[in-house]
Regions:
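Extracytoplasmic thiol/disulfide redox context detector
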Residues: 2-88, 92, 134, 138, ...
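Cysteine-centric redox/oxidoreductase cores and disulfide-bonded domains
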Residues: 86-175, 180-193, 197-203
Length: 203
């Protein structure tokens, strides 16, 4: 199970997060350069708070996001905003790598990481999983030097943690994925059928 394999990195991440929380809280309003799908002019904004090692997040991205995109994003009705809510160190590293890519490659990265979640998270230790993640970065043009620089970039780390802090404070996030539709927290099953009903109410 992914949960068992990442338990150590989760403990380390939680310690890191608590320490960083104090550092980042003073500047927790900076959320520039968000990862988005769709036009800024879209009247309906859907925020997706997710963690790259979360199986439910992977299912949502693979099963629901494409349908929202096809039915509402392409037509200009909806913009999807992807916000990092890492639950462990490996998800945190994946989030860092995401923000080292240009916008075109960011969406591709989301697709790859969620499509291959079972594969890249299947290492027996953190180093092996990290190497798997590095290979994904390499496929998108990130070499080993750039990858290491990315993971040690404090500005990127702060941005991710700030987004997590803001989401926790504003929406009381207690699980992933958490969906926010026009600033209202969506409750219930995150199936396309249920999301569609909420979108249709706003059109």
């Amino acid at each position: 199970m992914i949960k068992n394999k990442l338990i150590l990195s989760l403990k380390v991440f939680l310690i890191y997060f608590v320490i960083s929380l104090k550092v980042c809280a003073a500047d927790s309003n900076s959320q520039d350069k968000l990862v988005v799908l769709g036009a800024d002019e879209a009247p309906i904004k859907i925020k997706v708070f997710s963690s790259f090692t979360c199986p439910h997040c992977a299912n949502f991205h693979k099963e629901v996001i494409p349908k929202i995109n096809k039915n509402y994003v392409v037509s200009g009705k909806v913009q999807i905003i992807f916000i990092d809510f890492p639950l462990d160190q490996m998800a945190f590293n994946a989030s860092k790598l995401l923000h080292c890519l240009n916008q075109e490659k960011q969406i591709k990265f989301l697709d790859i990481v969620y499509e291959t979640q079972n594969q890249w998270t299947s290492g027996t230790n953190a180093d092996e999983i990290n190497n798997n993640l590095q290979q994904i970065g390499k496929s998108l043009g990130i070499n080993s030097l750039q990858y290491n620089k990315c993971l040690n970039d404090e500005a990127i780390s702060d941005k991710i943690l700030n987004g997590r802090i803001d989401g926790q404070k504003k929406y009381s996030i207690d699980s992933t994925p958490t969906i926010i539709i026009n600033e209202k927290k969506f409750k219930g099953s995150t199936s396309f059928k249920n999301i569609k009903k909420e979108i249709e109410k706003l059109i």
